[in-house]
């Protein structure tokens, strides 16, 4: 880990092996000394990276998208802090999760998975995350699981934004089959 830095992303043993055997042994020594932590097989992070509030989603769950509480927190739609990183994956996919940090997977069908995904830079990491409109639709869709108060907070926060896009919101609501319920929420708020 001493040599090349990978734009604040977690390091894989494959990347280090490309630099040579000596670099790989330095990585293993760093793990033994406690400067680097093994997240899961082949993925390593420094203690500074673990102290950060964001993780390298693509290193831990390749192809995963930040969703629900984690996405609401990043977009500033809720004041509650997530207890785990909520990551959406395509249904039927097998993923090995690390012990730390705590990750909750949410399997989603292929047709629903691609709706509203975008790339963002957060805490130096390039992350896949659902956009604000998709997040609002998810809050309405999972309102019984996350709680009505959290759902109302997300909808209210979105409606208070100056850059809200209601046409895109209703398009996503149609595709995610929550339009009728979302219209009821918005009718009460506006």
Predicted regions, residues:
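Residues at alpha-helix termini
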Residues: 32-33, 74, 175
């Amino acid at each position: 880990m001493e040599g090349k830095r990978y734009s604040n992303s977690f390091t894989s043993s494959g990347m280090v092996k490309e630099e040579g055997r000596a670099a790989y042994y330095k990585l293993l020594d760093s793990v033994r000394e406690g400067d680097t932590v093994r997240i899961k097989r082949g993925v390593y992070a420094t203690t500074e990276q673990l102290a950060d509030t964001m993780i390298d989603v693509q290193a831990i769950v390749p192809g995963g998208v930040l969703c629900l509480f984690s996405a609401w927190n990043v977009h500033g739609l809720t004041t509650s802090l997530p207890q785990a990183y909520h990551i959406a994956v395509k249904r039927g996919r097998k993923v090995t999760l690390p012990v730390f940090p705590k990750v909750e997977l949410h399997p989603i069908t292929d047709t629903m998975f691609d709706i509203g995904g975008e790339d963002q830079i957060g805490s130096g990491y390039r992350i896949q995350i659902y956009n604000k409109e998709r997040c609002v639709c998810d809050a309405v869709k999972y309102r019984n699981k996350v709680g009505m108060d959290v759902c109302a907070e997300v909808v209210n926060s979105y409606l208070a934004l100056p850059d809200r896009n209601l046409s895109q919101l209703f398009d996503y609501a149609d595709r995610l089959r929550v339009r009728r319920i979302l219209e009821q929420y918005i009718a009460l708020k506006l």
